[in-house]
From Swiss-Prot:
GO terms for biological process: translation. This is Small ribosomal subunit protein uS12. The modification 3-methylthioaspartic acid is found at D102. Part of the 30S ribosomal subunit. Contacts proteins S8 and S17. May interact with IF1 in the 30S initiation complex. It comes from Bacillus pumilus (strain SAFR-032).
Length: 139
């Protein structure tokens, strides 16, 4: 327990909370060739590789992921949600934060229905999360 005098001299230092999606907290100035501290909710990037990986212990699947070089020159691993996708190398994608609990090192999600990423075909519920347009009403 500190004394009053110690608190007057030093004071309490509040903990700094680390970001869970650090690549979204950096911008890049291409003229000055330096990183800037500009935060953004999403970032654009180019896929450098697209593949599948297996999840951690109790689960079993082939989860789709893409390695993405962002516009701030940081390379991250992003999860491709939904069933089926049209991504390949050099596809331009939009990523958002949000980790995948059973894939180590995957801290970002690709936004479906934005830029080169198509929405999920035949999706009827939760369409907004998968970039699917509303189906036409037949009379």
């Amino acid at each position: 327990m500190p004394t009053i005098n110690q608190l007057i001299r030093k004071g309490r230092v509040s903990k700094v909370e680390n970001s869970k999606s650090p690549a979204l907290n950096k911008g890049y100035n291409s003229f000055k060739k330096e990183h800037t501290n500009v935060t953004s909710p999403q970032k654009r990037g180019v896929c450098t590789r697209v593949g599948t990986m297996t999840p951690k212990k109790p689960n079993s699947a082939l989860r789709k992921y893409a390695r993405v070089r962002l516009s701030n020159l940081i390379e991250v691993t992003a999860y491709i949600p939904g069933i089926g996708h049209n991504l390949q190398e050099h596809s331009v994608v939009l990523i958002r934060g949000g980790r995948v609990k059973d894939l180590p090192g995957v801290r970002y999600h690709i936004v479906r229905g934005a830029l080169d990423t198509a929405g999920v075909d035949g999706r009827m519920q939760g369409r907004s999360k998968y970039g699917t347009k509303r189906p036409k009403q037949s009379k």
